[in-house]
């Protein structure tokens, strides 16, 4: 771990004087975070804004800046650093005149001198919108959600060792299988229809005619079978009065496909395989396979039959919404993963 002091530019290798390293990434709205402990040193000074670089072998795993230091009576010092995504909390005035996500991303990164790279762009032009005093993250989130609704593609913004990248989340899939016989040591799993589950979508518009009367147009999409199982769970949303009937109908169907399901949550504790540098590809936004047998049924696998009538196992891809790598020492590396199904991402909850 290298530290470059923000006040005098001096560079120190602090690998031998730090402990309890944790690196956390989240899929939505949070910067990558590095925390560690060290002791007071007369030579080493950790100032706010100091740059930190962390490598595992030849692989760069964190590049960021010190934002917080704290100490206690015993002289223990806790340091918290964030990657470049922290600067997406900056607020801005921005007029989106109708442009692609990549165009907005490039403009905002350039304005705030952030290193960036566009890995993939959908070329989808989002509707115009004015942002007054909104965070850069919210400005970009608007375009991310518009792409999800308009193109059915989920784009993610993440920091890759000092470069903020825009990418299709499908490109972050890994081949890792985590479960009963691979890495996992404990888990917590739940299924629920109590939150963010709807089997009936009501969309409506409101406008006034020449006499001032309010005219309302409604469109309903529903799943009658699931209503028999769960009762009626309705979500009502007002949409733009300029939307066409076909747009409203399509929007209602899209929302029903997103919300008409049980919500599954899964948290896994795991141990990394020693000397596996690729394990750092397991981060928020990455896709992994799950293979767990639980009291509520198998997680991540389903029994199927192929064309020849033979039984087969189908694996489902899951997305990591939050990931923490914890390093006690070089030989003890653990992970804590919060998992969501690939078919339901946080941005899908945005709706209109």
Predicted stretch roles:
Residues 1, 45-50, 149-151, 159-160, ...:
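A short, compositionally biased
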Residues 1-9, 163-164, 200-206, 288:
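Short polybasic amphipathic segments
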Residues 1-91, 177-190:
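Assembly/oligomerization scaffold segments
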Residues 17-44, 185-352:
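An acidic/polar, Gly/Ser/Thr-rich interaction patch typically located in mid-to-C-terminal regions
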Residues 34-36, 66, 81, 93-117, ...:
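Amphipathic, non-transmembrane alpha-helical segments in extracytoplasmic/periplasmic proteins
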Residues 56, 168, 292-294:
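Conserved "cap/hinge" positions at secondary-structure junctions
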Residues 65-67, 78-82, 165, 200-204, ...:
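Soluble periplasmic/extracytoplasmic beta-strand elements of cell-envelope proteins
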Residues 76-77, 83-84, 120-196:
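Short beta-strand-centered interaction patches in the first periplasmic/extracellular domains
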